[in-house]
Amino acid sequence: MSIYNALYGRDGHGVGPNEPEKKGFARFCQMVGRDLGQLLGTNLMVCVLCLPAALGVSLGVTLLSLPLTVVCSAVTGLLTGPAMVLLADCALRSLQNDPSQWLPRAKQTLAAHWKAACGFGCIGTLVLGLLCFVSAFVFEAAAQQGYYPGLAILVFLALDFLVLAVLATLCAAVLPLQLPAPDSLLRRAGRLLAVAPARCVLAGVLMLAGIGGMILLFPVSVFWAVLFGFWLPGLAAMQTLFPVLRQEYGVEVRSIPRPAAPDKPLTAQEQKKRSRANWWYYNWGIVAVAAMVIVGVAYVAHG
């Protein structure tokens, strides 16, 4: 059961009775503290689904084999697409204040959109694999000639990766939405880009920085990927796009109903006990992750 089920109907941590919805970094911290359990669970599933793509594409790029890169990218993309849809749906669930259990919602989303997700993942991963192959080929050819690739080539490759990140982020954001009328995926993504280009580019930059950094540091980044690698940039990117999704597609946000006032006022000891329980409801996930990080660092330090 989601941690939010226990909180639905309660006052949130640091939220006053007449306080408006939190914005920016405060809202991000509120979602992380409230839904870290489902974020970590989704992150683990995304890691498992993306692992074949990471291994297959890296093998083709390392061997500088274009046929192997194309085949591995296209085949493993059938898993990468659903993974990105799960990630976006998980972030949207937190942004919507949805108190439902996260795993049944993830199953419903995949059941409704798995065909489109597989197609989106196949094409996106294929383009990513080709870009990685071209980058590796350019650097290898330059190294054999004894010089470094020029600035124009680096800028061109960086822009290609940025365009791919923006389009992939927008497609992943609009794919899980339940729309009254069917529409093509690229048209929905283009609509967001036309309405708020700055937000769309920023969301793509966040995803590129988070996931692209893991790709560059793979396999060293495996530990980071399992804990934070996908949900952290994914939640930040979806939060950036969420105002546009609310405006263009009417994505609803559930308000948290205030509980009925108690029959008699709480004593100071009861208020302290309730406050302590409320803090643990919101922050148990952060404490668990901090403990995992400390144990991991201690294990690596002492060999």
Language model features by range: what are they?
Residues 147-155:
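Juxtamembrane helix-entry segments on the extracytoplasmic side of multipass membrane proteins
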